[in-house]
């Protein structure tokens, strides 16, 4: 579970190892399906907590970086682990609850629902926590962004994970015809419908404006004492002056120097 959690984080920026999803989620479905009747709640809680920790510790490892901006806070950087543990516990509790009350629902449909529900609950608790959404997995693919435009982040997250779980159906071949009918009715047909709508909207949208966008991720070395705040600011200013783009975006860890 710890390994699967870590591998799941590689689907997200900046890695975007998209094909991994077709290995990770069928494996997770197989584990859950084989153990859902035999595992105790305590054992399940431990397993899902390990999955969450493996996922969040790599995916949100950068959260510690703001602690290194100032000398006064760098000794408190381990505080970021509290966020990792809290998110892991939330994910684990939701997994246990949904699996307990959804015993008769195929695991193929439960897994995407669990992750999407977790995404929603975390966004409510943390007032729109912006980093935990599986819709980010397709953010580097302009051809798949129609899903975000048409569905929004939550439904896009569900669809992405549901597609990743597809190999599980063919591996187990349990209730294959029934699950394929559900999949066609609730997933495939809506996607085809929205693809057609997306193509039509592009054809009808005659007013377009192209702008140049440049994104900066200036990862200053925290252990480099020669990099004073003034030097970091000068580096940011130099990048701004050299850029010819219409819109510039800097990462949040560069804001303290602006």
Show which residues each predicted segment covers.
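Membrane-embedded alpha-helical bundles of multi-pass enzymes
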Residues: 1-201, 256
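Soluble catalytic regions of membrane-associated enzymes that act on cell-envelope
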Residues: 197-258
